[in-house]
UniProtKB/Swiss-Prot annotation:
Pfam families: DnaJ, DnaJ_C, DnaJ_CXXCXGXG. Residues 364-374 have a biased composition (Polar residues). Zn(2+) 1 binds at C154, C157, C211, C214. Participates actively in the response to hyperosmotic and heat shock by preventing the aggregation of stress-denatured proteins and by disaggregating proteins, also in an autonomous, DnaK-independent fashion. Unfolded proteins bind initially to DnaJ; upon interaction with the DnaJ-bound protein, DnaK hydrolyzes its bound ATP, resulting in the formation of a stable complex. GrpE releases ADP from DnaK; ATP binding to DnaK triggers the release of the substrate protein, thus completing the reaction cycle. PANTHER family: CHAPERONE PROTEIN DNAJ, DNAJ HOMOLOG 1, MITOCHONDRIAL-RELATED. Gene3D superfamilies: DnaJ domain, Heat shock protein DnaJ, cysteine-rich domain, Urease metallochaperone UreE, N-terminal domain. It comes from Tetragenococcus halophilus. This is Chaperone protein DnaJ. InterPro entries: DnaJ, DnaJ_C, DnaJ_domain, HSP40/DnaJ_pept-bd, HSP_DnaJ_Cys-rich_dom, HSP_DnaJ_Cys-rich_dom_sf, J_dom_sf.
Length: 386
């Protein structure tokens, strides 16, 4: 019998990992296996395997329950807490004077637990969609329309799953509770537990004549489109939550949410690097410009700007262009662009150019042969003195 993998192991993090470390691991896996990015046949299946571990470990209550009770604690029905979180032992010893209190304890161990109202409205599942952005789109933002498949409320039956003109009926076996009593043999003897009704499968309702459109599910698969306004200054791996754009709910419950994952590609821009709101650019200049100084055009994402290079500038010298970086997501400010100077050494000199450099070296007392020779013997003298 196959055993479930440890959720921390699935995400590749330690049990003491912080929330940021868990999110970082999830983003890494999403970028690797998301079906929109990875075209391998089993990518979608691999992608699904770490959805529940992420949903569990990113929620403080669910994570605490998982750490204490393992996979049983991650079950939405464990202890009667329902999808909203962890609810403990389903009533504990509130009725310890009779069988009911002990029944609650046995149920939490042997698969029962008090079930939530099966007819209560329940929110639909969340969905995820990924958008690939160019370097410029991530910096300046983008408005786009995305289309995807989702379950919507059936237009024929209105979501109740029954043929028009008919209505679902209360389940004759569980009387609408969605669960039934059952005896189970345990190491402690025979005990009464509650389990999902095998007639209505936990819905508390029976549909005699099903809707021909949705076949009794109350949902139908449709292509849904929504406008997404990506703000300026987003970073790789960030998510946007679009409320009520996920799957349809049940029993009149609201739609789930759509989480849009943003993937920002630096490959579309080969001259800039970026870290948050800071943009980095390497400026090539020749040694004459470095020695004498110059005024040069520097490209930025906002257009070219003039930059004065002081005389005697050395390679790796940094300049900061205020307000020429990427917008910050919070507030109306903008980051800076950092410019790093890289002095380019000339290649393939002709004889006239070589002679000019030799003359320059003599005028400044920088004979290359003398420097190399003196430098070598000075090092040897220092070595023998030690």
């Amino acid at each position: 019998m196959a055993t479930k993998r440890d959720y921390y192991e699935v995400l590749g993090v330690d049990k003491g990992a912080s929330d940021d470390e868990i999110k970082k691991a999830y983003r890494k896996l999403s970028k690797k296996y998301h079906p929109d990015v990875n075209q391998e046949a089993d990518a979608e299946e691999k992608f699904k395997k770490f959805q529940k571990p992420m949903n569990t470990l990113s929620d403080p209550q669910k994570r605490a329950a998982y750490d204490q009770y393992g996979h049983a604690g991650a079950d939405a029905n464990f202890g009667g807490g329902g999808a909203g979180g962890f609810g403990g032992f389903g009533g504990g010893f509130s009725d310890a004077g009779g069988f009911g209190g002990f029944e609650d304890i046995f149920e939490s161990f042997f698969g029962g637990g008090r079930s939530a109202d099966p007819n209560a409205p329940r929110q639909g599942d969340d969905l995820q969609y990924s958008i690939n952005l160019t370097f410029e789109e991530a910096v300046f933002g983008k408005d786009t329309e995305v289309s995807y498949k989702r379950n919507e409320v059936c237009h024929t039956c209105g979501g109740n799953g029954a043929k028009p003109g008919t209505q679902p009926e209360t389940c004759h076996k569980c009387k609408g509770s969605g669960t039934i009593n059952a005896e189970r043999q345990t190491p402690l003897g025979r005990v009464m537990t509650r389990q999902t009704c095998d007639v209505c499968h936990g819905t508390g309702k029976e549909i005699k004549e099903v809707c021909e459109t949705c076949h009794g599910t109350g949902h139908e698969k449709k292509t849904h489109s929504v406008n997404v306004s990506v703000p300026a200054g987003v970073e790789d791996g960030q998510q946007m939550r679009l409320a009520n754009q996920g799957e349809a709910g049940t029993n009149g419950g609201p739609y789930g949410d759509l989480y849009v994952v943003l993937y920002c590609s630096h490959e579309t821009c080969n001259i800039f690097d970026r870290d948050g709101s800071e943009i980095y650019y390497e400026l090539p200049i020749n040694f004459v410009q470095a020695a004498l100084g110059d005024e040069v055009d520097v490209p930025t994402v906002h257009g070219n700007v003039k930059l004065k290079i002081p005389a005697g500038t050395q390679t790796s010298t940094k300049f900061r262009l205020r307000g020429k970086g990427a917008p910050r997501l919070r507030g109306n400010s903008t980051g800076d662009q950092q410019v790093t100077v890289k002095i380019i050494t000339p290649k393939n000199l002709n004889e006239e150019q070589r002679e000019a450099l030799r003359n320059f070296a003599e005028l400044t007392g920088q004979s290359t042969e003398e420097q190399q020779s003196e430098g070598f013997f000075d090092k040897m003298k220092d070595a023998f003195k030690k």
